[in-house]
Amino acid sequence: MARTHIPGFPRIGAQRELKFAQESFWRGESGEPHLRGVARELRARHWQLQQDAGLDFVTVGDFAYYDQMLNLSALLGALPQRFGFEPKTLSLAEYYELARGNAAQPAMEMTKWFDTNYHYLVPELGPQTSFDGGVEWLFEEIDEALALNLPVKPVLIGPITYLWLSKSHVAGFDRLSLLPKLVIRYARLLDKLRQSGIEWVQLDEPALCVDLPAEWLDAFSAAYEVLGTSGVKVLLATYFESAAEHAPRVAALPVAGVHLDLVRAPQQLDAWRAALPAHAVLSAGVIDGRNIWRADLGEIVESLQSLQAEFGERLWIAPSCSLLHVPVSLDAEKKLDADLKSWLAFATEKLAEVATLALALRDPAAAEPALAATDRALEARRRSSAVVNALVQKRVAAVSSAMAERQSPFAERNRLQREALGLPLLPTTTIGSFPQTAAIRQARAAYKRGELRALDYLQRMRTEIEIAVRKQEELGLDVLVHGEAERNDMVEYFGEQLWGYAFTENGWVQSYGSRCVKPPIIYGDVYRPEPMTVETTRYAQSLTQRLMKGMLTGPVTMLQWSFVRDDQPRSTTALQLALAIRDEVVDLEKAGIRIIQIDEPAFREGLPLRRADWAAYLEWATRAFRISAAGVADQTQIHTHMCYSEFNDILPSIAAMDADVITIETSRSAMELLDGFGAFAYPNEIGPGVYDIHSPRVPGADAMQRLLERACEVIPAERLWVNPDCGLKTRGWPETEAALANMVRAAKALRAKLAARQADELTA
């Protein structure tokens, strides 16, 4: 009989209870006992959902107060030494300082979790890292679950993935040299789990699904030779891609089972069936853990029947990966179109799908009603007239190569733009959004509830726009933005105005820490029926003589940060989005807007995990961006923004996007991203972020000037812009104004310094 489990469950709560408890704690409105109490209630609720669904295991260890990698660093005792915290007595206040920074130290670096929109905190390791152990919150959670008489399966990120995703700031240091000490700590953790009565532990090694060097693979084997004999059974979990080439290696190790992502990489199954020894468990990840579409259970049952015949009780059924990446439940969706809702499955519904698959193998007749309901919903989706739009299909078919090219090369455009825009050396700007105050959020909520008339809402938003414009003028910024007061989310705002999109009331997903996003659903062909931002941007420009940027979200980010239809290639959906955004760019230019920013912070996260698959993605992704941007005259300056992106290895494709100006996140990584731009001789203009907006810490003007001077060593000052790392939506006005004042001060000081140097050279 097949067994059932999940790799992980969303931690935020169906009503974002964790987010609100975190933020209350940060504001000092509640203490650690309240936060711990909310966390305990959420864990118990989520375990009960798994138990009620009939799963054979409940997963423990997927909860984190901020991030699972930070939790693991705390458990291992591998905290950044610069904070001076004692790992074994780490408080929640100190834990959050690691994530958010404090007056003395900037936050730990944050970056994307593989190719998802979740962010993790990058471990900081070095020769001094000892892995002597730290706070054992995991064991407290296991005790909670055992006290509820639940069948516990703990989950930990595995040692190879932990090291692979870490960084060292010590030149020449090999992180892999830490593995022997790290394995000793893991072995002790597994032994403690054994003593707690745990039978199975899930060790997540998604790093096996990327292009690991040979020495890392050898290190993996050495590590699991030890960990596989710890006395607790190890389920080695891979996900997000195929790990087929490692099947013989894993089969030779003393691991008790392997979990495979058979949604993203169904082709790997044959290799694993051939390699796995007779005792090994195969956990089949057959329910999509990263998208929200209802699974074709009938088709999956057919594929599982042969696996059951081969593996029997050694077959486990699961989602492809942790359900962290999907919303908690459809129960709260009262306004969603009934047909569309019937096509969906969120985390709680996916628990039922897993259980139904196991039931269908065990008792086909008992599962028949559920399977029949699924078949009806999927057939209705296939036949729906809401999915295919003939107008969009015709336009996509008419796209030409010329639509992806600007009128002139960058050098000529740049000359014309300098003449037209008249900007100083090192022009200052921001990335787009300004603080979303309580007044803004309350007005938007009242408007959505029907308690505020459209005209009154428009006037309130215009008041906020004027406030933002006046503050920017007072600060002395060169290129202004309208502040995006009217926007709840950079994707949702546009999706609400496009055909082919749908929106949930409560479909929240954790992005990082307390930051939750509510991805829209692309269910059909995408089309822009009317302008989306033109009137707002035109109004903002009317308030000032300075240049006002139009602010749009690019096609790749619209795609990456949505739940995307799975019935056509993602490249086709990206092209539809590009055409919609192209129309908006052209209309902004007609309205007199001379600088238009098309944000693509998610560009790199769309990369396949395997380098061999990159070229195809980069071709259609860069083409989509160019199509969105190329409909304007040479004098119109196109900006793009990328944050949390490590893209030195795809710089040719970044250059191929042909944006006139790119702004990037660099402050947390001390401008190291710029080294690649310099070595590549990136031809266009660039704005390296000079301060980290994700921390409340206000950096001084001197610190920002030093970063700019470092940037000038790599990129000529004539091609540099000065800006924060990212938008300022989540910050408060006092810290925002203080930081921007220092940023402008730094830019002016460096301008003066460079001018003086130039004068000295002329007189020498």
UniProtKB/Swiss-Prot annotation:
Entry annotation: catalytic residues? H694
Q: Name one GO biological process term.
A: methylation
What the entry lists under CDD domains is as follows: CIMS_C_terminal_like, CIMS_N_terminal_like
> Any idea which UniProt keywords this protein has?
Amino-acid biosynthesis, Metal-binding, Methionine biosynthesis, Methyltransferase, Repeat, Transferase, Zinc
Give the binding site residues for Zn(2+). H641, C643, E665, C726
Concerning its family, UniProt says:
Belongs to the vitamin-B12 independent methionine synthase family.
Q: Where does this protein act, in terms of pathway?
A: Amino-acid biosynthesis; L-methionine biosynthesis via de novo pathway; L-methionine from L-homocysteine (MetE route): step 1/1
**Chain sites annotated for binding 5-methyltetrahydropteroyltri-L-glutamate:** R16, E17, L18, K19, K112, R515, C516, W561, E605
EC number(s) reported in the record: 2.1.1.14
Going by the entry's taxonomy, the superkingdom of the source organism is recorded as Bacteria
PANTHER family the UniProt entry points to: 5-METHYLTETRAHYDROPTEROYLTRIGLUTAMATE--HOMOCYSTEINE METHYLTRANSFERASE (PTHR30519)
For this entry, the protein name equals 5-methyltetrahydropteroyltriglutamate--homocysteine methyltransferase
What NCBIfam families has UniProt attached to this entry?
A: met_syn_B12ind (TIGR01371), PRK05222.1 (NF003556)
Residues reported in the UniProt entry to bind L-methionine: I431, G432, S433, E484, D599
SUPFAM superfamilies xrefs: UROD/MetE-like
